[in-house]
A protein has these predicted regions:
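Mixed-charge (Asp/Glu-Lys/Arg
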Residues: 1-99, 104-254
């Protein structure tokens, strides 16, 4: 599963493209006293470009800020681990078309042990509420697979129409506040384990949804614009994300 990454290590040679945090994320952590700026003068100079050592665990407890900092794949990994702590066997697709399902939930108590008992859709949105359209789409996938229960998890909120539709169609909704309340019911050890999932590996660098690999920071030749690009560009992957929207840009669109 995607969250089972090894411990974070700096690439040999200090590759600036890989060990530099997006400026918006670094600025936030430096001002909060959670990140030591490697060239010390850069913070005093208004966070001028410079290499920064990514923190292994920038936050020690759960809050909305965790979901604002980590990339979309880390968010989905936390959701998967959270359901795993509840006793479900989970299965996820690391990349590529997911058919509307981010996580499959299986139960050892189900008559057919191989059949999923529920499916989960995740949206790491920050600026928009999840609407009835997205919830209807999940219901359609449930019907396609003959599954009676579904779960929709988001880092934002749901519209009133979405909540009304979900209530009558076997779909559990988990907004950011509900997600944090659910995490708070876990033991301190389990909560720390979930934080380790959230901040595993290069938690600030977005994952290519098509290839399943980490995007790298690129600079456009003509405009000088900095963006996230896929290392498989030469092989045909055109995935690009604007750095200014941080790692969550991939999922922060309706």
């Amino acid at each position: 599963m995607p969250w089972r990454n090894g411990p974070h290590t700096r690439p040999p040679g200090g590759d600036a493209e890989r060990d530099r945090l997006p400026r918006a994320i670094a600025a936030r952590l430096i001002r909060a006293g959670r990140l030591a700026d490697v060239p010390a003068a850069s913070a005093a100079a208004g966070l001028a470009p410079g290499r920064r050592e990514p923190p292994r665990m920038p936050l020690g407890q759960w809050s909305r800020e965790v979901f604002e900092l980590v990339e979309w794949r880390r968010f989905e990994a936390v959701v998967e681990a959270l359901f795993g702590q509840a006793g479900f066997e989970t299965r996820s697709q690391p990349h590529g078309a997911d058919g509307g399902v981010d996580i499959w939930l299986h139960s050892i108590h189900h008559a057919d042990g191989d059949a999923p008992v529920s499916i989960v859709q995740c949206k790491q949105w920050m600026r928009w509420k999840v609407g009835v359209k997205e919830v209807r789409e999940l219901r359609g996938v449930m019907a396609q697979h003959g599954i009676a229960r579904g779960q929709f998890v988001t880092t934002s909120d749901f519209t009133g129409d979405a909540r009304e539709f979900a209530a009558g169609n076997g779909i559990g909704l988990h907004d950011v506040d509900g997600l944090l309340r659910l995490i708070a019911t876990r033991t301190p050890e389990q909560q720390q384990a979930l934080l380790q999932v959230a901040f595993a590996g290069d938690w600030w660098r977005p994952t290519c949804a098509s290839c399943g690999i980490k995007l790298v920071e690129r600079t456009a030749r003509q405009s000088g614009r900095i963006f996230w690009g896929c290392e498989n560009y030469a092989r045909g992957c055109k995935t690009q994300l604007p750095v200014r929207y941080q790692a969550r840009a991939a999922a922060d669109k309706p």
